[in-house]
Amino acid sequence: MSLKAIAFDWGHTLMDERRDEHIPLDIRPVHLMPGVADVLPQLPLPLALWANTRVARETEVRDWLGRAELGLLFQWVITSVDAGARKPAPEFFRYALAHCGLAKGNVLFVGNQLNTDIAGGEAFGIRTVWLSGFAFHSFDDHPCIARPTYTIDTLYGLPALIHKLQD
């Protein structure tokens, strides 16, 4: 199936959560992960944000995206609070696809967590991209974790991968 959208995890994929974790999202300083501001605007497909959040709903996440000057880039924002389930649960991915109006084969999901982003996406039948340069786990740590469809070290590798997939 043809690629129609790219979905991203939030923490440590787009936003550096290692800093200021204790500060509420609405006043938290914006710290983007490397490549976000350079790469996302040049991607040729609609973008979605699929995030595990503790309390934040779509409106709070959209406010943060606006402060990060990324708000206009995201057509869809899905939070686990709104979905009523957290990644890797299939209910999260079912809700995200339905809300975005996408089929499993039409989306590419980019994340840094093997145990939530990649395992959940792969189990649900979604193509995944593991952002390995900022990952908390490796295959050496957890050999039974699902393997991603694709692996890139940083977001700077994503445009070439998208181009390859669209050829």
Listing of model-derived features with the role each one plays in the protein:
Residues E21-D26:
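Conserved phosphoryl-transfer catalytic core
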